């Protein structure tokens, strides 16, 4: 196994951890927003729910990207749509960061998901280049 494939596998394993963390934090925001609803104004309430939805999407896409990355690290011909999903994770993670200035913890986790997805996309391209040699 080459260094690029090992790095793709390590990044994919880290993505699984951050996908679970992002999903847990998004579910905490979902559970907490009805309790805060009486104390907060409507735009803040809606932004918190929108952010929780975006972070849930990021979590599921990150998990899918991680599974594709692990399979692709073991067998590079199985990378499939990993690059496309990694770009989608990066875009969704950045969107979640933009829409959630109030919820700092969730923004940080989504930003780390986006950074890991960009790094996984870079190593995806390197592993694909190894196949073509």
Short names for language-model regions:
Residues 1-31, 43-46, 127-133:
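Cytosolic juxtamembrane helix and N-cap/initiation of the first transmembrane helix
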Residues 20-23, 94, 118:
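Hydrophobic residues within the alpha-helical transmembrane core of Major Facilitator Superfamily
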Residues 32-39:
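Peri-membrane helix termini and adjoining interfacial loops of integral membrane proteins
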Residues 39-61:
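A loop-to-helix transmembrane entry motif
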Residues 57-64, 112-120:
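Hydrophobic cores of alpha-helical transmembrane segments in multi-pass inner/ER membrane proteins
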Residues 61-89:
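Loop-to-transmembrane helix junctions at the membrane interface
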Residues 88-109:
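Membrane-helix boundary connector in multi-pass membrane proteins
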Residues 113-133:
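Membrane-water interface at the C-terminal end of transmembrane alpha helices
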